[in-house]
Design a protein with these regions (language model features):
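Residue-level recognition of oxygen-bearing side chains
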Residues: 139, 289, 302
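Residue-level signal for nonpolar/aromatic packing positions in well-ordered secondary structure
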Residues: 124, 140, 168, 215, ...
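Active-site-flanking alpha-helical
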Residues: 145, 272-273, 296, 307
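C-terminal helix/juxtamembrane-tail motif
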Residues: 301-310
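Proline- and acidic/polar-enriched loop/turn elements at helix boundaries
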Residues: 99-100, 288, 309-310
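GST-like fold's C-terminal all-alpha helical module
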Residues: 172-295
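GST-like domain detector, emphasizing the conserved glutathione-binding G-site
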Residues: 2-14, 18, 22-200
Length: 310
């Protein structure tokens, strides 16, 4: 088990430290949508249990689970797995990462399917809570921050206020339902589809740009409000339009989607923002507020550790 706030990973082959580089090697959609035969899986599980020589490392893990901390099941090219790792790292929680080998079908191992019937990553096991398993990145994140709040009375990435919780959750669900899937589809049709479908590439890339337009507007409004609040001496000139906001000393100051600090609403976007250049979107030129926001988050030590897979 790793020390507090750090991650010790387990995976086959040499680790890929850069998420974007990992995407070049593995198909995002190799998190297969295969039909699961539960009876067959149960039989396979029984056979492996009765034959120790044939046991995979996944079987071995489930038969020898740790008694504390968390285990995150991820993949070197899966942004959603890194998204969960960022939250675990930010909250300084003990966790171990197992990077599944899709080439060997580890995501379809019977034991893994028992904790994630969708046979995809990420999935998380909380060993201090009766080995509770959670799957889907949004559900995992909500579990982590809710538990942290309950145990500590406050959570730096969440809120104890119901209204603010709903606002944070709205952006989190926007990321999981609109942002990530559209980038994933754009990547698929650009690099991995069996034949060229320019209309699909265009459709999904345009939708990603629309999503970033929503973020850009929200962050720009936050930027304007912050400048008007802090740069009091020049507020009248900004309001009159005689002085552009870009001249304010607060123009590059960090702003967040909700409140005055980074929350899961912000951090959930980081891994996907880190690979969006691969579909031809230049955040710095096209969405400058999103770019600045992302760069501020990418400088956080917890984010750096998580994206490295440390």
């Amino acid at each position: 088990m790793s020390s507090s706030g750090q991650n010790r990973n387990s995976g086959s082959g040499n680790p890929i430290s850069n998420l974007s580089a990992g995407l070049k090697q593995v198909n995002l959609n190799d998190q297969q949508q295969n039909e699961v035969n539960l009876n067959l899986l149960q039989q396979q599980l029984q056979n492996e249990t009765n034959n120790p020589k044939s046991q995979s490392r996944i079987t071995h893990f489930f038969q020898n689970q740790p008694s504390e901390g968390y285990t995150l099941f991820s993949h070197r090219s899966a942004p959603n797995g890194f998204k969960v790792a960022i939250i675990l790292s930010e909250l300084n929680l003990n966790f171990n990462t197992i990077f599944l080998d899709f080439n060997n079908g580890e995501q379809r191992a019977p034991e893994f399917v028992t904790i994630n019937p969708n046979a995809r990553v990420p999935a998380l096991i909380d060993h201090q809570n009766e080995n509770t398993s959670i799957w889907e990145s949004g559900a995992i994140i909500l579990y982590l921050v809710s538990k942290y709040l309950k145990e500590n009375g406050e959570c730096p990435l969440w809120s104890d206020n119901l209204i603010e919780q709903s606002q944070i959750a709205s952006w989190l669900f926007f990321q999981t339902s609109g942002h990530a899937p559209m980038i994933g589809q754009a990547l698929h049709f650009r690099y991995f589809h069996s034949c060229s479908v320019p209309s699909a590439v265009e459709r999904y890339t345009d939708e990603v740009r629309r999503v970033y337009g929503v973020l850009e507007m929200a962050l720009a409004e936050r930027r304007e409000a912050l400048i008007m609040d802090l740069d009091v001496d020049n507020a009248a000139a900004y309001s009159a339009g005689t002085t552009p906001l870009s001249q304010s000393r607060y123009f590059d100051y960090p702003v967040w989607l909700i409140g005055d600090r980074a929350t899961v609403a912000d951090l959930s976007f980081v891994p996907w923002n880190n690979v969006v250049d691969r579909i031809g979107i230049n955040l710095k030129n096209e969405f400058p507020e999103v770019y600045k926001w992302t760069k501020h988050m990418m400088r956080r030590q917890a984010v750096i550790r998580a994206l490295r897979g440390d």
